[in-house]
Each structure stands twice: as C-alpha cells, then as structure tokens.
Amino acid sequence: DIKRMNELDVLVVNGIGHDEFIFDILNATDRKKDIKVIYANKNVSLMPIAGSIRNEKVMNPHTFISITASVQQVYNIAKELGELDPANKEFYLKNARDYAKKLRKLKTDALNEVKNLGNIDIRVATLHGGYDYLLSEFGIDVKAVIEPSHGAQPSAADLEKVIKIIKDQKIDIIFGEKNFNNKFVDTIHKETGVEVRSLSHMTNGAYEADGFEKFIKMDLDEVVKAIKDAAAKKGKK
C-alpha cells in the first residue's frame, strides 16, 4: 500500500472517520507533502446515524451509498481536479455533469416505481447505519440500528432492546448487508417475524468503471421491491 501511495499525485478520501487508516499509510510515504488529498464530502450535507440503540450522536459517514450525496461528491472531486489541472478543467466538469445525469436518472426511475403508492408509512430497521442516505432518497427514516457500529457485535442487552423497538415500532422491513452472514439478523427475524432484505455496502469486489452504477441500482431496486411488498401487505397497490 505504501508503494502504491508513493505513485499517486492525488488521493480522494471519503473522510468523516470512515477511512482514517489511509492517513497512516500517507504519512509513511516519502511523498506525503506532494500528494494532494481531496475530501469528497466537502460541503456535503451530513446526517446523524438514525435509530442508534445506544442513543449515540454520531455523524453518518456512508454518504457514498446514495445518489444525492454521491452527485455532490462527484462535483467536489471534479472541481478540485480542475484546480489542480486547470488545462483540463472543462473535461473534468463535463465528465461530472454526464455522470451526475446518469445517477439522477437511476434515482428518478426508482422513485417513479413507487410514486403511485401514495403516502404509506414504511417502517425500517437496518443491520448497521450504512443505509440512512439511501433510504432518505425515498423519504424513509430508520427506526432502529442493530449493530452499535459497523462490524461491532451487539450485546444480549442490545438485542433485547432492538427486538422490543422493532415490535413496538411495528417495523416492516429489516435491511441487512448483502454477502454478509449475520446471525443477529437471523435471531431478530425469528423473534419478530419481520422480513429481512439485503443491500450492498459497495466496499469490496473488483474495480469496474461502472461498478458504482451497477451496485447502487441493485440497492435502489431492492428498496423499491421492499416498499412495494410492504405496501401490498398494507393494502395499497
């Protein structure tokens, strides 16, 4: 990682405490003063992690699992690159505009799928606080988060508390993480009977130029399907 870092001119980070480890690598390089760091979340509106079972007030770093915040990030990166490389400023901005247009269409298409369902109260819990920004695109607030923090195991008391919240709040859907086997979600499903759906965290796998579009569309499609199914159960079609 240090060798690869030494070959960079620019480093783009998410920030907000999500990728602090990268600065240890940066500080270990010979060229740390020469590498420009771009903070993708500069001026992006942040949300606190909703539904924390321990009532912790922490800003949510998962802005990249969304459309609205990701578009802001794209423009931030393009602007910063244009300042570093003025000769190609218009090239970066055009790419940003074209990409933002693609992302906005994905959001529009998803919202059009559920717009005729009317004002329905879809109640959601999540495995961790990774999906607040994505769900907010649909006007959905997260009522409960199972893990105290991403990857942290909830205690028996935490599980008891979240099961009570899910029952009291009449939660319709639990969103877990795709390709992540979590026994706590299974336990909660057995205790509450609430359906579990899976979303991508988009932090692994091979790099592909259109990878973000593919994964975010999969997530949008999964949320749309969950909303439709919940609406059908509530008698709205």
Language-model features, listed with the residues they occupy:
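Extracytoplasmic metal-acquisition and chelation regions
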Residues: D1-K237
